[in-house]
Amino acid sequence: MLYPSIDALQRTIPSKYTIVTVAAKRARQIQDGKAPKVAEPKSYKPVGQALEELFSGDTTIIVNEKNNG
C-alpha cells in the first residue's frame, strides 16, 4: 500500500495535479543527489521519499501566478 495515501495527501494539498507535479520535481532532485528531508524515509525510491516529504510538511510549495493583465 502506498504511504502516504492520496487521500491523506489531499487533506493538505487539495489538487492531485499539484501533488504529482511537486512530487515529480522533488523526486528528480533526490535522484540527482540531494538528500531527502525526512530523517528515516519508509520508501527507498525517490518518488516515495518526495511524497513522504510532502505529507510531513518538509517541502514547501511555491506557486507562480501568471498575471494576465
Curated annotation (Swiss-Prot):
Gene Ontology annotations for the cellular component aspect, listed alphabetically: DNA-directed RNA polymerase complex
The protein's Enzyme Commission number: 2.7.7.6
Catalytic reaction(s) noted: RNA(n) + a ribonucleoside 5'-triphosphate = RNA(n+1) + diphosphate
MF (Gene Ontology): DNA binding; DNA-directed RNA polymerase activity
Gene Ontology BP terms: DNA-templated transcription
Domain of life: Bacteria
InterPro entries found in the cross-reference section: DNA-dir_RNA_pol_omega, Pol_omega/Rpo6/RPB6, RPB6/omega-like_sf
Keyword Transcription tagged: yes
Keywords noted in UniProt: DNA-directed RNA polymerase, Nucleotidyltransferase, Transcription, Transferase
Subunit structure: The RNAP catalytic core consists of 2 alpha, 1 beta, 1 beta' and 1 omega subunit. When a sigma factor is associated with the core the holoenzyme is formed, which can initiate transcription.
Alphabetical list of PANTHER family matching this protein: DNA-DIRECTED RNA POLYMERASE SUBUNIT OMEGA
Described purpose of this protein according to its UniProt entry: Promotes RNA polymerase assembly. Latches the N- and C-terminal regions of the beta' subunit thereby facilitating its interaction with the beta and alpha subunits.
Family of the protein in this entry: Belongs to the RNA polymerase subunit omega family.
Name under which the protein is recorded: DNA-directed RNA polymerase subunit omega
Biological source species: Exiguobacterium sp. (strain ATCC BAA-1283 / AT1b)
Protein's gene: rpoZ
